[in-house]
Design a protein with these regions (language model features):
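GT-A fold catalytic core of metal-dependent nucleotide-sugar glycosyltransferases
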Residues: 81-139, 146-147
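A glycosyltransferase accessory/donor-loop signature
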Residues: 1-9, 16-19, 142, 147-235
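Short Gly/Pro-enriched turn/cap motifs at secondary-structure boundaries
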Residues: 77-78, 134-137, 167-170
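Residues at the starts of beta-strands that form the adenosine-phosphate
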Residues: 32-33, 97
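Active-site-proximal specificity loops/subdomain of glycosyltransferases
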Residues: 43-90
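Short internal beta-strands
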Residues: 33-38, 126
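Short, polar loop motifs at secondary-structure junctions
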Residues: 37-42, 111, 130-131, 193-195
């Protein structure tokens, strides 16, 4: 099974995206990392003249047609790129599965086990978080999501998810759509795979640390420290 990771973001997230991806590459063997961005290539002022590691490829999503600019979530607090994961089955038609990782995640150990995990006929594997009031069912955080793209394409459920985010306000963007349409077919994984203190059970030895929501200021400091550390991956 190919190990494919995907990060997405607008230009203001490029710096975090590069650091997040290099934390993954430092610990884990992968076959491909995709950056879904707003440019044809990653800016040299961020990655330096040496460019990105060879395993990383960029897709320019500025001309995407899945999400309408007059839709209720396109210009929300988060950028339209946060809607892209519901279209991954079509963005990556050649892939059987991908691991979606938010730009504000740092991989701290080898996550090969997550890449190779048996999804047991579920659409995704995700970490559960406390139920939000508007949802009368188990709610999962999408910041780390292993997706069975073949299953999505077979059922076409992602098309309903795309229609949902184009037609109604989703405060958590694609995350709401995953929880509505994949409910009952989400494999629950432990908090060590997506450790964000305000949304998941605390774990002292996480594989992936997620600086989400209220942890953003601390996350920005952590990313700067990571970038400056002697063991940061260099090409």
């Amino acid at each position: 099974m190919r190990r494919v990771a995907v990060y997405m973001g607008t230009r203001n997230y490029y710096g975090m995206m590069e650091i997040a991806a290099k934390s993954l590459l430092r610990h884990t063997r992968v076959d491909r990392v995709w950056f879904l961005i707003e440019d044809d290539k990653f800016p040299e002022e961020i990655c330096g003249p040496q460019g990105l590691p060879d395993v990383i490829r960029c897709k320019n999503m500025s001309g995407q047609t899945w999400f309408t600019q007059d839709g209720p979530n396109y210009n929300a607090h988060w950028t339209y790129t946060c809607l892209l994961p519901v279209a991954y089955p079509e963005i990556f038609p050649e892939e059987k599965r991908v691991l979606r990782l938010d730009d504000d995640t740092i991989v701290e150990k080898d996550i090969g086990e997550l890449f190779d995990m048996d999804l047991e006929d579920n659409y995704t594997a995700m970490v559960e978080e406390p139920v939000r009031g508007k949802f009368p069912f188990r709610y999962f955080n999408a910041g780390v999501t292993l997706m069975d793209l073949e299953k999505f394409r077979q059922t076409g459920i992602h098309r309903k998810m795309i229609r949902m985010v184009n037609s109604m306000v989703c405060t958590a963007m694609d995350q709401d759509a995953f929880n509505v349409y994949c409910q009952g077919q989400i494999k629950k994984i432990g908090p060590e795979w997506n450790m964000a203190e305000h949304i998941t059970e605390h774990h002292n030895d996480p594989y992936i640390r997620h600086y989400a929501g209220c942890l953003k200021p601390r996350g920005e400091r952590a990313f700067r420290e990571y970038e400056q550390a002697e063991w940061r991956v260099k090409e």
